[in-house]
């Protein structure tokens, strides 16, 4: 069951669901979602002389991105073909019986601005700001202003609370994140850190 506006308001009032700060409840609550605003921090992807990015090598990932902070009232220009990581202004706490999904606002979509590439799911139990995967699919630069409404959060009620909500156990590497976070896929259990380090050292000595 997808929560309606009244359902969302009731959850917010009892603090079963946390979305904060909300400066204008009437403007941000939609018929079956809540609008989230753009934060001030961005991670931009740089051109690099690395032949390819190995997702499990933190130093390569960190070399690939740089942080930009845009004060509220100023603009971040998203150029055609650009892909950057942004963040929501709001911090959320999703209860264990809800699944949230991030959707782009239609008005931005009509300007060819996409809010997420693949990561549209916010797991039950997640706490923190939400990283946005922003891209411009159009032919003209688009000015984005921190504080503007850029996405919608839709809530689906589970048939029963999750037995292992995000943050309770395994693989919760983005729990309580603030600001946009670059990929930490290298922390996934399928990557053997010992083997990777040995291979990396071997490459550096050849």
UniProtKB/Swiss-Prot annotation:
Region (Disordered) location: 164-206
Keyword Electron transport: no
Keywords from the named record: Hydrolase, Nucleotide metabolism, Nucleotide-binding
Function: Catalyzes the deamination of dCTP to dUTP.
Protein's UniProt name: dCTP deaminase
Catalysed reactions listed for this entry: dCTP + H2O + H(+) = dUTP + NH4(+)
Gene Ontology molecular function: any one: nucleotide binding
Segments of skewed composition (Basic and acidic residues): 197-206
Any single GO BP term: nucleobase-containing small molecule interconversion
Organism: Haloquadratum walsbyi (strain DSM 16790 / HBSQ001)
Top-rank EC class of the record's enzyme: hydrolase
Pathway: Pyrimidine metabolism; dUMP biosynthesis; dUMP from dCTP (dUTP route): step 1/2
Subunit structure: Homotrimer.
Keyword Nucleotide-binding: yes
Binding site for dCTP: 105-110, 123, 131-133, 152, 166, 173, 177
Family in the record: Belongs to the dCTP deaminase family.
Annotated catalytic residues: 133 (proton donor/acceptor)
Enzyme Commission numbers on file: 3.5.4.13
């Amino acid at each position: 069951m997808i929560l309606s506006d009244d359902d969302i308001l009731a959850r917010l009032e009892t603090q079963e669901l946390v979305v904060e700060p909300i400066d204008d409840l009437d403007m941000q609550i939609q018929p079956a979602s809540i609008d989230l605003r753009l934060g001030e921090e961005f991670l931009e992807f740089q051109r690099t002389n690395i032949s390819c990015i190995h997702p499990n090598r933190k130093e390569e990932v960190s070399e690939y991105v740089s942080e930009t902070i845009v004060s509220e009232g100023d603009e971040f220009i998203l150029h055609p073909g650009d892909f950057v990581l942004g963040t929501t202004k709001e911090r959320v706490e999703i209860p264990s019986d809800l699944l949230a999904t991030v959707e782009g606002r239609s008005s931005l979509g009509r300007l060819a601005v996409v809010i997420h590439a693949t990561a549209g799911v916010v797991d039950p139990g997640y706490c923190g700001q939400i990283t946005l995967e922003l891209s411009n699919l159009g032919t003209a630069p688009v000015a984005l202003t921190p504080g503007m409404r850029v996405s919608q959060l839709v809530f689906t009620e589970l048939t029963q609370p999750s037995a292992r909500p995000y943050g309770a156990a395994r693989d919760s590497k983005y729990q309580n994140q603030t600001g946009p976070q670059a990929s930490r896929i290298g922390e996934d259990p399928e990557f053997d850190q010992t083997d990777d380090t040995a291979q990396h050292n071997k490459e550096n000595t050849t």
